[in-house]
Amino acid sequence: GTSYADVIIPYYELPNNAMKENIIGLDASAYNLENGKIVRTKMKKDVVFKERVGESRMNLKFSIPQVKAGTLIEYEYRVESDFFFSIDSWKAQSDIPILYTEYNVTIPEYFKFNIEMHGAEKLETVNENASLNLSIGSQLLRCSGTHLNFQGNQLPALKDDSHVWCADDYCTQVNLELQGIDFPGSLYKSFTQSWEQIDETLLKDSDFGSRLKMNNPLKEEMTALHLEQMKGADEKICAIYTFLKNKVRWNEKYALYSKSPKQVLKEGTGSNADINFILISMLKDAGIPAYPAVMSRRDMGILPYSHPSIQKLNTFVVAISPTDSTLVYLDSSVENGYLNVLPPVLMTNRARIIAPDNNSQWVSLENVGANLLRELLQAHVKLFI
């Protein structure tokens, strides 16, 4: 349980500070009962660290001190973001009980958001008129807006269950999606996205689309495989996969975006995305078409068809086309390179193959392998009449 004191807050920071987010006002404390008195221990700034995890992605990491069984932990922070078009969902529940949680958002009048609340637990909500300064370029505009306050008190733990696809789908939470911007004297600009637009966004992303265009970083070493002597595509795929897995070990983390392949190969370890992008480049170099099939992991919630959202995507597997009419799947989180053998967390009912020239498509990964589970129950019943 003490692992809850190790907190990671992801945020964005584009190169050259073109657009960025700042985490400010961070404050964290631990409360312990000692000799009948509540003792508060505040976190010091020297345990707060920043970590770059991609060209545009950062993590703020900190550890709350003096945490043990029975400790109450508390932390708060504020996000200042240039990415007004993307506000992260706020989850009021966790897999441990929440004594109190609060979320505040102030929205200028020109921004039109779709606000969705769902979950079984009740949140106290307050909507108030607000007056604020809005920075637009070098201009400071005084405008009105709406301040939204959401509070949760004594929320129960939301435990995972083997019979539930994803407990997070039932979590009490608030989702905000920007629908459009309506400035005076300007045309209304819609921000509602389609899946085709999300395809394009990913293909242009430096930590995703650029990885699909990279040259095979193991091109010279791969000649030792003598792929030209192998008969079928399946044999080549398995040989390439085994060769790569001997170079890079999976670090047990799933991701959507990747680090530099040079860095991954140097460290000898990486996320499934780090390794999968290298695998795609190697397969393409061998003349075997391969694409990322993006998804939301089963433990992260169902990917919605009707509400396209890039925030719902969190990883991908490799979709391989050994022939024009077939697709097989691989993921670097699997130790042995068996085709169509995926861990249960990746066997989702919907994934989207990202391909150039508007050739993206939806696929289901629920039944990619011929898996059958049988349970036999024997019981002896005694009847007393």
Report each predicted region and the residues it spans.
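Short, conserved helix/loop micro-motifs enriched in His/Cys and acidic residues
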Residues: R249-G270
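Second-shell loop/turn segments in exported
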Residues: L14, N59-S63, M222-M230, K262-T269
